[in-house]
Amino acid sequence: MQSYNVAVLAGDGIGPEVMAEAMKVLNKVQEKFGFKLNFNEFFVGGAAIDHCGYPLPAETLKGCDEADAILFGSVGGPKWTNLPPDQQPERGALLPLRKHFKLFCNLRPATLYKGLEKFCPLRADIAAKGFDMVVVRELTGGIYFGQPKGREGEGSQTKAFDTEVYYKYEIERIARAAFEAAMKRNKKVTSVDKANVLQSSILWRETVTEMAKDYPEVTLEHIYIDNATMQLIKAPESFDVLLCSNIFGDIISDEAAMITGSMGMLPSASLNEAGFGLYEPAGGSAPDIAGKGIANPIAQILSAAMMLRYSFNLNEAADAIESAVQKVLASGHRTADLADDSTPVSTAEMGTLITQAI
């Protein structure tokens, strides 16, 4: 029997509540599909600060090093906002984890499920078509990290500058991740650039076009970033995998998230070249609703499904979870963030319904 070690970092706010439901679902699929997940739980974020004084304790990092994947909840909250920036939960835990594991590839799915069209802010006829896409964003290169960057001069002569830098190998590895993702989906990649203006985008387009030769089954399209933001609003159903540089992916992934209508539904993954991943909901720790049993656990559950698919290659089990989510939503069950009536299901009830639908 295949066996995998999972470091479980529930974190703060609604993290522990929604993580409990993801574990419920994972226990069901491992039993049904015949593999073994060994869960090891560790403190992270504010919970770790309260427990031992550090947002990312050595014991937690060691546990992650020994794991095959990290299932992450959420970190942060008003309790810890007065700490020095590098000791706050987000900057002191999540960013060091990304750096330590060299997580260069961010996957952000955005799906509009049947029955949830009215939450989509787009025109009704566009929302009625639905959409199911994933944004593949390069995380470690580009203008956020390029040198030189800085600020100099005085008065009206003050200037500030940033540099967009991409090496070919950085583009090759993120392009490969996008094509591999497309192979597990609808076999279409739309590469986003600004090759009519930027040298970095010209290299991006050339490199992605070369990489496409290794994936003859996948259709490749190129689109300028300005047009991409328009087409996301006009025809989101036309996209499958969107391949983006760091800054373009930052913008596009948030735009795609917003048109789904609920952040509580959106998972994400950050991967390194070995396929090791950190999987987490795209939303935050929502301290205002923590402990009330009303948080939507679907983003955490779908993050667990992504872990099965992208780190463990357990596609059948991942499909089963995603289908169960669709089934439960189609049958009209909603948590408070999506409920039409005065009787929404609780966090635990939603987790149980999805587990039963597998």
Curated annotation (Swiss-Prot):
Essential cofactor(s): Mg(2+); Mn(2+)
Domain of life: Bacteria
Annotated Gene Ontology cellular component terms: cytosol
EC number: 1.1.1.85
UniProt keywords, alphabetically: Amino-acid biosynthesis, Branched-chain amino acid biosynthesis, Cytoplasm, Leucine biosynthesis, Magnesium, Manganese, Metal-binding, NAD, Oxidoreductase
UniProt-annotated location(s): Cytoplasm
One example GO MF annotation: NAD binding
Binding site for NAD(+): 77-90, 284-296
Gene Ontology biological-process annotations: L-leucine biosynthetic process
Keyword Transcription set for record: no
Catalysed reactions listed for this entry: (2R,3S)-3-isopropylmalate + NAD(+) = 4-methyl-2-oxopentanoate + CO2 + NADH
InterPro entries, per the entry: IsoCit/isopropylmalate_DH_CS, IsoPropMal-DH-like_dom, Isopropylmalate_DH
Pathway in which the depicted protein is active: Amino-acid biosynthesis; L-leucine biosynthesis; L-leucine from 3-methyl-2-oxobutanoate: step 3/4
Residues the record lists as binding Mg(2+): D226, D250, D254
Positions bound to substrate: R98, R108, R137, D226
Comment on bound cofactor: Binds 1 Mg(2+) or Mn(2+) ion per subunit.
Site residues, Important for catalysis: Y144, K194
Subunit structure: Homodimer.
Functional description taken from the UniProt entry: Catalyzes the oxidation of 3-carboxy-2-hydroxy-4-methylpentanoate (3-isopropylmalate) to 3-carboxy-4-methyl-2-oxopentanoate. The product decarboxylates to 4-methyl-2 oxopentanoate.
Protein family according to the UniProt entry: Belongs to the isocitrate and isopropylmalate dehydrogenases family. LeuB type 1 subfamily.
Official protein name in the record: 3-isopropylmalate dehydrogenase
